UniProtKB/Swiss-Prot annotation:
InterPro entries: NagB/RpiA_transferase-like, Ribose5P_isomerase_typA_subgr, Ribose5P_isomerase_type_A. It comes from Edwardsiella ictaluri (strain 93-146). Keywords: Isomerase. Pathway: Carbohydrate degradation; pentose phosphate pathway; D-ribose 5-phosphate from D-ribulose 5-phosphate (non-oxidative stage): step 1/1. Catalyzes the reversible conversion of ribose-5-phosphate to ribulose 5-phosphate. The lineage of its organism: Bacteria, Pseudomonadati, Pseudomonadota, Gammaproteobacteria, Enterobacterales. This is Ribose-5-phosphate isomerase A.
Length: 219
């Protein structure tokens, strides 16, 4: 199976976690897009979705799935999204698609986080994939200096503005031995909106696309 076929397999496998009559939290990226396509086959059975990005909102609407503002919703049954890396403790690096802040907010509201990935995203130690940090534009240089103090090598993602109008610093050369501690430290830097470490609130279920099928992992 190609990587895209693995992504499609896990996107469709996540449908089994969708309960009729609920509002579904939907992530962003190529794997999440396959889930959105699958979700469209159930659109008559669900109330609708809450989206983590403008791109996913457009895809949901194009398929006839009602999209709710998160402020209209008290809680979400599930949130389904991909990841750039996931470790054995179900902690993730996310934000390669620059939607990390809205993804983290929707994940916080959801009762269950279902992470959908192909097997290449599984790692023992997070950090090989550059860690995205969303930053208020005027704080970019200051935050970069603070990230260097934490042992990283931040690189400005030029030409990219988030849906919130902010910039992204991608932090290279990290071996993240204590994900929760680093998440808290980066979030404490003035000017940081959020960091793409999903450690304090990790996934509850991971669906991993492998050559021999979809594996289900839980803690």
């Amino acid at each position: 199976m190609t990587q895209d076929e693995l992504k499609k397999a896990v996107g469709w496998a996540a449908l089994k976690y969708v309960r009729p009559g609920t509002i579904v939290g939907v992530g962003t990226g190529s794997t999440a897009s396959h889930f959105i396509d699958a979700l469209a086959t159930m659109k008559g059975q669900i109330e609708g979705a809450v989206s983590s990005s403008d791109a996913s909102t457009a895809r949901l609407k194009s398929l006839g799935i009602p999209v709710f503002d998160l402020n209209e919703v008290d809680s979400l049954d599930i949130y389904v999204d991909g990841a750039d890396e996931i470790n054995g403790a179900m902690q993730m690096i996310k934000g390669g698609g620059a939607a990390l802040t809205r993804e983290k907010i929707v994940a916080a509201v959801a009762k269950k986080f279902v992470c959908i990935v192909d097997a290449s995203k599984q790692v023992d130690i997070l950090g090989s994939f550059p860690l995205p940090v969303e930053v208020i534009p005027m704080a970019r240089a200051y935050v970069a200096r603070e990230l260097v103090k934490l042992g990283g090598q931040p690189v400005y993602r030029q030409g990219v503005l988030t849906d919130n109008g902010n910039v992204i610093l991608d932090v290279h050369n990290l071996q993240i031995m204590e994900p929760c501690k680093l998440e808290n430290a980066i979030n404490a830097i003035a000017g940081v909106v959020t960091v793409g470490l999903f450690a304090n609130r990790g996934a509850d279920v991971a669906l991993v696309g492998c050559a021999d099928g979809v594996k289900t992992l839980t803690l």
